[in-house]
A protein has these predicted regions:
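Two-component system phosphorelay core
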Residues: 1-54, 58-113
């Protein structure tokens, strides 16, 4: 994987700007990211382009708001494919999305400790 999942400088900046409310955002992301990943994988398996599009779009947006630009970029790549009406997502992209999600969840979990 060539790009890191989380931009440390952007993450720190968002943390400073949001103060204590940032922990709430982190908690929401910790709940939503694994669920969104599972929904994306299920939508690909079930050939459900509508779910694939909407969930990848949500993931992209929420990741961008916390500085997880690498993960957002991978979600956007899936969003763009699904926007064209396809669920034919390259396996490497799904693997990269899964790995990036794991990285972001690890970083966010450590932040709450």
């Amino acid at each position: 994987m060539s790009q890191t999942a989380m931009d440390a400088a952007a993450f720190t900046e968002m943390k400073e700007l949001m103060g204590e409310s940032f922990n709430e955002v982190i908690s929401m992301c910790l709940q939503s990211l694994p669920a969104q990943l599972a929904e994306i994988e299920s939508a690909i398996k079930d050939n459900n382009v509508d779910t694939l599009f909407s969930v990848s779009h949500k993931m992209k947006s929420s990741c961008g708001s916390i500085g997880a630009f690498g993960l957002a970029k991978r979600a956007e790549a899936i969003e763009l494919i699904s926007r064209e009406g396809s669920t034919d997502i390259p396996g490497q992209l799904v693997d990269d999305l899964r790995e990036s999600t794991d990285q972001v969840v690890t970083i966010l979990s450590a932040e709450l400790k």
